[in-house]
A protein has these predicted regions:
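N-terminal targeting signals for export/organelle localization
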Residues: 1-51
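Short pre-active-site segment immediately N-terminal to redox-active cysteine/selenocysteine motifs
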Residues: 70-72, 76-80, 112, 149
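Conserved redox-active cysteine motifs that mediate thiol-disulfide chemistry
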Residues: 68, 76-93
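Active-site acidic short loop of glycosyltransferases
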Residues: 68-70, 100, 126, 148
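Structural microenvironment flanking redox-active thiols in thiol-disulfide oxidoreductases
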Residues: 85-124, 134-141
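A short beta-strand-turn-helix
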Residues: 46, 51-72, 140-143
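Thiol/disulfide oxidoreductase modules built on the thioredoxin-like
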Residues: 121-126, 132-180
């Protein structure tokens, strides 16, 4: 093997090592969740949400129009979504705490009624958990969730306007700051 080949192999090895280090560092530091503040006056998806009547985890029909006039935090989730499950205890605490007096937290499950009911029975969620099945993905897309990623959370003011959307696991410090502006 001559020196030119040896130098080329060494350069390739260094490039592979650098690539591996870069990938390894990004796995430890995942990208932050995406949040968006829609332009003022965005109400069309909220009107579509209020037109929905979805069954809860026990199969009881729940018209979402009953929440009109109240600030809402709508969380699109699924039982198989790890980050969704991780944020649920904090959402439950939020719903049953001081913030819950001013804000209606709602979970919209994107899965079968059976899976949602089993999950709800196991984890004892303190806020309404509704079943949308796969149509929940389309509903979340109306709020700007183009890829249908989960969890996806929408903060809606009492005025019926979308205040902010969050894609990925919620950062509750950021959420509490946003709630203070309602």
């Amino acid at each position: 093997m001559n020196k030119k080949h040896l130098a080329a192999y060494a350069i390739v090895a260094v490039l592979f090592a650098a690539s591996g280090a870069y990938v390894g560092m990004n796995k430890n530091n995942p990208a932050p969740p995406l949040t968006a503040v829609p332009p003022p006056g965005v109400t069309e998806p909220v009107a579509a949400l209020y037109k929905q009547t979805l069954p809860d985890a026990k199969g009881v029909a729940t018209p979402l129009a009953q929440y009109k006039g109240k600030a809402m935090l709508v969380n699109f989730w699924a039982p198989w979504c790890g980050p969704c499950v991780q944020e649920m205890p904090e959402l439950s605490a939020l719903a049953s705490g001081e913030e819950g007096k001013k804000l209606q937290v709602i979970g919209i499950g994107i899965d079968s009624p059976t899976n949602i009911a089993e999950f709800n029975d196991k984890y004892k969620i303190t806020y309404p958990v509704l079943v949308a099945g796969m149509s929940g993905t389309e509903l979340s897309r109306q709020f700007g969730n183009a890829q249908g990623g989960l969890p996806f959370t929408v903060l809606i003011g009492a005025d019926g306007q979308v205040k902010k959307t969050y894609l990925g696991r919620l950062k509750f410090d950021e959420l509490r700051k946003d709630l203070a502006t309602l």
